[in-house]
């Protein structure tokens, strides 16, 4: 008598193969079935490309011309047309047409990534709207925020949305430029066309068209490192001499 686990696996496999064949016959492009799992409830438009290692769950919908994968997970996400979703995960969200996601991005629930947005590597979006044409290219957390269109986020931006008791929202206007390593301590707003200087921790609103700077002024101390450098060089020379003996 066959093991129950084996029977269950074969049933799941048969169901997947039927789903796979249905999408293939409808014009969805698969180069290989390796590592692909697709729930029967998923909708995929003809012309979409599903690459190996892709898992599509629940009520996910994929638009025509979109390329999903490799190694991606989408659960209850609506994806528009001509989206690129590479080596990333998304849950309970909307990704509009022309967006490019990944690699290694995380789209958490209740997010909307609008048309032609770029979400790059090691970016996390949570309960936020990212406006049309905005670029969030790398190493950034956007949580509980409303971001306008055609904004640019530098590397290392963090929306500081949790005070230990409650979550708060940030608002970033259209055409804003958020400098590298900016912390936006919610609730704050950055106005249309405003800039934040790299390395700033923004705790007050930045008006439209303004530059927000919130960082200590640099101080150089001449010759401060000279003694340390001399000791380090002497230590390295001693090691080299000992090793040559």
Question: Which sequence ranges carry the predicted segments?
Answer:
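Terminal amphipathic alpha-helical/low-complexity segments used for targeting or macromolecular assembly
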Residues: 1-47, 207-245
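Thr-Gly-centered strand-to-loop micro-motif
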Residues: 32, 38-39, 51, 137, ...
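Glycine-rich hexapeptide-repeat left-handed beta-helix
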Residues: 85-245
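Acidic, glycine-rich loop-and-beta core segments that form the ion-binding/anion-interacting portion
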Residues: 38, 43-118
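Residue "hotspots" at secondary-structure boundaries inside conserved domains
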Residues: 22, 36, 40-42, 60, ...
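Short, functional N-terminal and low-complexity linear motifs
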Residues: 13-19, 32-34, 49, 64-70, ...
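Catalytic cores of large soluble enzymes that bind and process phosphate-bearing ligands
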Residues: 4-8, 58, 182, 186-188
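Glutamate identity and glutamate-enriched acidic tracts
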Residues: 2-4, 17, 21, 43, ...
């Amino acid at each position: 008598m066959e093991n129950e686990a084996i029977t269950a696996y074969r049933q799941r496999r048969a169901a997947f193969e039927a789903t796979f064949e249905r999408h293939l016959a409808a014009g969805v492009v698969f180069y290989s079935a390796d590592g692909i799992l697709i729930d029967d409830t998923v909708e995929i438009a003809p012309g979409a490309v599903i690459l190996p290692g892709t898992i599509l769950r629940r009520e996910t919908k994929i638009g025509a011309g979109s390329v999903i994968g490799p190694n991606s997970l989408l659960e209850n996400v609506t994806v528009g047309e001509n989206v690129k979703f590479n080596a990333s995960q998304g849950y309970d969200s909307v990704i509009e047409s022309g967006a490019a996601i990944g690699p290694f991005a995380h789209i958490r629930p209740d997010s909307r990534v609008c048309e032609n947005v770029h979400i790059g590597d090691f970016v996390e979006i949570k309960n936020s709207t990212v406006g049309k044409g905005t670029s969030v290219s790398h190493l950034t957390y956007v949580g509980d925020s409303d971001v306008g269109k055609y904004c640019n986020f530098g590397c290392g931006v963090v929306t500081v949305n949790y005070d230990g008791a409650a979550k708060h929202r940030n608002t970033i206007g259209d055409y804003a430029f958020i400098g590298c390593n900016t912390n936006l301590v919610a609730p704050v707003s950055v106005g249309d066309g405003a800039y934040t200087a790299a390395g700033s921790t923004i705790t007050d609103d930045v008006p439209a068209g303004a530059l927000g700077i919130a960082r200590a002024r640099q101080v150089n101390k001449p010759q401060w490192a000279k003694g340390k450098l001399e000791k380090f060089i002497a230590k390295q020379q001693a090691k080299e001499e000992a090793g040559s003996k």
